[in-house]
């Protein structure tokens, strides 16, 4: 039986690491890339708190790549940013999933560090709006794949 999908992360060690992924999420791939960049390298519990603050509109996500026509957010030295609530909720589910996978393996959830998190474009869901005079306007919805790998840090 063929594998349905893989991970872009190489050298996965099942004894020290846990991973999770979500496929075909109906979230923006551009904002997902920005949130993943911000979470990469964080401790897992800190990342969950950060996402809670984004969902509560307390902390914005800085936009480094996809920031054309974005206003600056409050805070000293803070440039373009947004509060991507839908993306934060989806990524939070994946982080909780990887945390549960790590606990199931016997890893300590307080020592988990996000060593890999990535957002990839998924398939486009195509649709049509009927318009006047027999025309139709396309509406396409982007989907996103998220993958996370955490590692237990020895202190």
UniProtKB/Swiss-Prot annotation:
It comes from the Archaea. GO terms for biological process: cytoplasmic translation. One of its GO terms (cellular component) is cytosolic large ribosomal subunit. Keywords: Ribonucleoprotein, Ribosomal protein, RNA-binding, rRNA-binding. CDD domains: Ribosomal_L22. One of its GO terms (molecular function) is structural constituent of ribosome. PROSITE patterns: RIBOSOMAL_L22. This protein binds specifically to 23S rRNA. It makes multiple contacts with different domains of the 23S rRNA in the assembled 50S subunit and ribosome. The globular domain of the protein is located near the polypeptide exit tunnel on the outside of the subunit, while an extended beta-hairpin is found that lines the wall of the exit tunnel in the center of the 70S ribosome. Part of the 50S ribosomal subunit. Belongs to the universal ribosomal protein uL22 family. This is Large ribosomal subunit protein uL22. It comes from Pyrococcus furiosus (strain ATCC 43587 / DSM 3638 / JCM 8422 / Vc1). The lineage of its organism: Archaea, Methanobacteriati, Methanobacteriota, Thermococci, Thermococcales. The gene is rpl22.
């Amino acid at each position: 039986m063929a594998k349905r999908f893989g991970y872009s992360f190489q050298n996965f060690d099942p004894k020290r690491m846990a991973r999770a992924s979500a496929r075909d999420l109906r979230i923006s791939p551009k904002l997902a890339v920005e949130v993943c960049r911000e979470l990469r390298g964080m401790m897992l519990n800190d990342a969950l708190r950060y996402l809670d603050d984004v969902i509560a509109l307390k902390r914005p996500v800085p936009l480094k790549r996809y920031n054309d026509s974005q206003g600056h957010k409050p805070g000293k030295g803070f440039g373009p940013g947004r509060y991507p609530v839908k993306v934060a909720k989806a990524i939070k589910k994946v982080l909780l999933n990887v945390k549960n996978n790590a606990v199931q393996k016997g890893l300590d959830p307080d020592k988990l560090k996000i060593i890999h998190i990535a957002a990839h474009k998924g398939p486009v869901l195509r649709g049509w709006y009927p318009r006047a005079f027999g025309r139709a306007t396309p509406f396409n919805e982007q989907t996103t794949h998220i993958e996370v790998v955490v590692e237990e840090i020895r202190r």
